[in-house]
Amino acid sequence: MNTFSQVWVFSDTPSRLPELMNGAQALANQINTFVLNDADGAQAIQLGANHVWKLSGKPDERMIEDYAGVMADTIRQHGADGLVLLPNTRRGKLLAAKLGYRLKAAVSNDASTVSVQDGKATVKHMVYGGLAIGEERIATPYAVLTISSGTFDAAQPDASRTGETHTVEWQAPAVAITRTATQARQSNSVDLDKARLVVSVGRGIGSKENIALAEQLCKAIGAELACSRPVAENEKWMEHERYVGISNLMLKPELYLAVGISGQIQHMVGANASQTIFAINKDKNAPIFQYADYGIVGDAVKILPALTAALAR
């Protein structure tokens, strides 16, 4: 048996749902999708869900992860085994841990390849900071996986598809984190997974203010703006959702223009599938040039305005 009887899918990020659904179609006979609203439910059916389970009734101050209890109960009620697919977002990994505990299931994060043999999942993902690929065969009846972006192609919606919709009512967990305040995200929504052209900045850009130079280039060529992990996590110059690398975005654009990025393996794992890599770095010995199809050795702060002017013509 090279498929599971059932797969359960949930994505806190709508843009990641199509690829998870495509993976679900390849890995199981019946697809169940947890959703948060009717619009997501309709989308899930068009993407191939046989059953949609609408999570309902959560108080505003509670976190989405607090649905883990009723999600696990629903999964157990409909089969003694199964596969759970989640995106490798922060929330996806938090939910994976909670579901793994409740289902007594093995959890594997950042999966880049998933296959099924004899009813058991085999998962490959990067280990040792991207220096090697580890393979795990999951022996527990339930398997909970968080999937790296780009692992599966996006499923295409089909408006003629039909499916059944059910409601899963909120049940307060015995122990939970309560949200006491929220802060609106300052950036516009970003969908880097689908971008044809990506301009990505590293700490070599020099300062947060200099990122505006990369933004101007993006406007000139119709590209999306991304960054390296240090820019997002250490310097806090850009949002977490934009960083490319082993533990976040894995991109496959037509062009990846790396600006001031050294090219460490942990970053390049997320960019090396690009059709063309163009690097700008003032260090001629930077590892990025080993991956680049084209490169310019020089100061990005001086090069970007000239490049933008030339490409905007």
From Swiss-Prot:
This protein's superkingdom?
A: Bacteria
Q: Does the keyword Coiled coil apply?
A: no
Query: Which pathway, per its entry?
Result: Amine and polyamine metabolism; carnitine metabolism
Q: Which PROSITE patterns match?
A: ETF_ALPHA
| Single GO BP term | carnitine metabolic process
- The positions annotated for binding FAD are 255-283
Q: Which UniProt keywords apply?
A: Electron transport, FAD, Flavoprotein, Transport
GO MF term (any one): flavin adenine dinucleotide binding
Family membership? Belongs to the ETF alpha-subunit/FixB family.
This chain's function reads: Required for anaerobic carnitine reduction. May bring reductant to CaiA.
Oligomer and partners: Heterodimer of FixA and FixB.
Q: What is this protein called?
A: Protein FixB
- The scientific name of the source species is Escherichia coli (strain SMS-3-5 / SECEC)
> Its encoding gene is what?
fixB
